[in-house]
Amino acid sequence: ATLHNQDEIDRKDIRINDFVLIERSGDVIPKITQVLKNKRPQNTQKFSISDYKWPDPDCKIERIEGEAAYRCINPNCKSRVMGILEHFCSKNAMNIEGMGPQIVKQLFEADLLNSFDDIYKIKYEDLINLDRFKNKSAMNLIDSINQSKKTTFPRFLFGLGIPNVGQHISKIMDKYCNSSLEKLTELTVEEMVEIDGIGEIVAIAVKDYFNDNNNKNIVERCLQLGIEII
């Protein structure tokens, strides 16, 4: 079951070592419906997401204002970077078959992968000497990377991992911008909030993302390395 909302944890008084009832309806992610307090052990402990000890000592998580979510605020956090890369490669984003979490981690640790554009610099020779890779698997991954170069505006925008920009928002932006990243980057926050379905939080997140020179440079390098939005 998913349980990432501190307010919900507090409201239901869910503690470590508790017994709970879990309900699933259709394809919806299972949810905790009840704590069995009559079975509560003496060793239960209250849980706070903010107390989580991140593997990287330089990392710290903070709750995003106005949201239930907590995020690591260290831009160089290894777990965060790998998570962003995994998202970019995922089925609903760039759909790079074979580039799952384990391969992303392996390439990251081999210093072959640190940002999106690095994916399109990977060569067969980089892979063949790594564990898990044989001739066929290396060739298959290179083929998958090359096939992903032809993509759509919604897939690419969603893949960037901009906060609050999911698949639906990406499609709205695609329609308004006529599949033009250049037009998207030129929009002001005021112009974006006038788009039906786009709120201020999303508009600010998009503007902040493309105002960051590092982000802009990575996107530009991806395009230079052959990504074609069709």
Residue ranges of each PLM-predicted region?
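Short, structured beta-strand/loop micro-motifs enriched in basic residues and often containing a Trp
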Residues: 1-7
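Accessory alpha-helical DNA-binding modules that contact the DNA backbone or grooves
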Residues: 15, 27-230
